[in-house]
């Protein structure tokens, strides 16, 4: 049986060279998976890189499609941090897409809702106003906070909810929420 050929990553995305030249003194990395290129930036550089990707005419990423939170707890491969925030950017003029990822490591235990100073990134709502609700969802589900967000509060769960349930250390069956809070069925509504 012949060994399967592993595809070699194609890191020839035209945006990578432009960004690396513009941010020559910054630590930038790039990965490619199944034809999708991801630019990895440090949290402190995120906002500047995102503004550049939007405003530089050679990049012109005019549309933020999504903001995603990821918890890499117990991930089989080594990662640069426990949590990641991933931005899906599109350029309609150039019919191009790139993902931008930044990693965060918690500085306190993650089993509650305590505010962790290490789980902060700058909001991009000033660049793409549509990021407002997706950033709120990442905050609600993962506890990652966005500096300068115009309305950072929970979007799916109530304010007093005692956890961020998409964290991998959150129990699958919850922490007694079904017993503590009344569930409204269709017949009750």
List the predicted regions and their residue ranges:
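Terminal low-complexity/charged segments
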Residues: 1-189
């Amino acid at each position: 049986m012949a060994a399967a050929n592993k595809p070699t990553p194609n890191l020839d995305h035209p945006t990578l060279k432009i960004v690396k030249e513009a941010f020559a003194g910054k630590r930038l990395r790039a990965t490619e998976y199944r034809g999708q290129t991801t630019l990895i930036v440090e949290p402190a550089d995120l906002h500047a890189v995102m503004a550049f990707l939007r405003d530089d005419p050679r990049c012109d990423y005019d549309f933020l499609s999504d903001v995603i939170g990821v918890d890499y707890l117990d991930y089989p491969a080594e990662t640069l941090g426990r949590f990641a925030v991933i931005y899906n950017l599109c350029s309609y003029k150039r019919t191009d897409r790139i993902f931008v990822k930044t990693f965060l490591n918690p500085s306190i235990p993650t089993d509650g809702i305590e505010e962790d100073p290490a789980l902060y990134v700058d909001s991009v709502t000033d660049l793409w106003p549509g990021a407002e609700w997706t950033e709120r969802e990442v905050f609600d589900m993962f506890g990652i906070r966005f500096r300068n967000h115009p309305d950072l509060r929970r979007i799916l769960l109530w304010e007093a909810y005692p956890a961020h349930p998409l964290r991998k250390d959150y129990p699958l069956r919850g922490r007694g929420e079904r017993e503590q809070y009344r569930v409204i069925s269709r017949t009750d509504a």
